[in-house]
Each structure stands twice: as structure tokens, then as C-alpha cells.
A protein has these predicted regions:
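Fold-level signal for large, globular catalytic cores of enzyme and receptor domains
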Residues: 81-142, 147-154, 162
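OB-fold ssDNA-binding interfaces and closely related basic DNA-contact patches used
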Residues: 1-117, 173
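OB-fold single-stranded nucleic acid-binding module
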Residues: 155-174
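Broad gene-expression machinery/nucleic-acid interaction feature
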Residues: 55, 147-149, 165-167
Length: 174
């Protein structure tokens, strides 16, 4: 079972600085074999249970046309391998602006919390950079799976000698 957090809940968390429903905490730092650094899992807890990772749902309406999916705000193109697709969108439309602001605020909250433990390192806002640029990568099984709804999983924080940032993956919500 996974607990999914909605955009309004993220907005509330960003505005108040706290949540009566969710508590975030970081697990033990472990060496990262992919990069020279460390990985720390993020856990989310409620009064009922605790789980690894943070799951956020968000939606973007899409229109399908051949191999490229286009509407006024969104288009996606398959990269041709590993079931990875790039979603291109206008981050400044009303619908998309709300989504990007919420996700950016969530990333900022997590990195601020983590940064309190390592003040000498610089945060890297990779989600913010991608979303403000109007793109993100998703994982899906079939090209006809585009439904305009996605799940962002933030599994933890990576840390190198000088910087740190969130580790995340986007998938199609089914």
C-alpha cells in the first residue's frame, strides 16, 4: 500500500510549514555505488503507518496524435528505449503552473529539511530546473498508456562532496 499526497496537501504544507497528517524523516545515510557519495531514504509517516518514499499525484490533459502527443500545453516524445518518455509542456499555463509550483515547493521543503543536517553543502533543485524548463521524463510500459495523470515518487536524497538533491521517478498513474 502506498500513501499518495495530493497537490492541495503540498500547498498547505508549503504555506504553513507543517502538516498535521504527514511527518517526513530521513533514514540512515548509505554509500551510493553509482556516484561517489551517499543516498538517504525519505520516509513518510502518519498516525497509522510509515512507508519509504513520497508519492505525489498530478494531472496534465493530453491529446494523442501518432507517436507525438500534443495539445495546447503538452506534447510527449518517446526516446526509443527503456520505456522512458519525455513530457514537454508549457509551465506557465494556469493548470500547469499550479502543478509545477506545488512540486517545486515540495522539493524545496525536503531539501531545506535535509540541508539543516549538512549546512556546508549546496542544494541542487533538479525537479525545479526540469519543470521550469517545461519537461520531465516518465516511465511507462506502452505508448498508448498516456492518460494525463502521473505519480512522482521521491525516494530520497543523494549527496556528493559538495551538493545534494532529491532522487525521483515519474510514472503513469493507472
Amino acid at each position: 500500500m502506498n500513501l499518495v499526497i495530493t497537490l492541495p496537501q503540498i500547498k498547505h504544507l508549503a504555506q504553513t510549514g507543517s502538516s498535521s497528517e504527514y511527518f517526513f524523516f530521513f533514514m540512515e545515510r548509505k554509500p551510493n555505488i553509482i556516484m561517489d557519495g551517499f543516498f538517504t531514504k525519505i520516509s513518510v509517516s502518519t498516525s497509522y503507518f510509515t512507508m519509504n518514499g513520497l508519492f505525489l499525484t498530478f494531472g496534465i490533459r493530453e491529446k494523442h496524435t501518432d507517436d507525438v502527443y500534443i495539445n495546447d500545453a503538452v506534447s510527449s516524445v518517446q526516446n526509443g528505449y527503456d520505456n522512458k518518455y519525455y513530457i514537454y509542456f508549457d509551465p506557465y499555463t494556469i493548470e500547469n503552473r499550479y502543478t509545477t509550483e506545488c512540486v517545486i515547493q515540495l522539493e524545496e521543503i525536503i531539501l531545506k529539511m535535509y540541508g539543516n543536517t549538512i549546512p556546508s553543502k549546496t542544494p541542487v533543485y533538479s525537479l525545479k530546473t526540469q519543470l521550469q524548463g517545461g519537461t520531465f521524463k516518465i516511465h511507462r510500459e506502452r505508448s498508448n498508456e498516456m492518460q494525463g495523470k502521473y505519480i512522482l515518487k521521491i525516494s530520497g536524497v543523494w549527496e556528493s562532496a559538495h551538493s545534494y538533491g532529491v532522487t525521483y521517478k515519474c510514472t503513469v498513474y493507472s
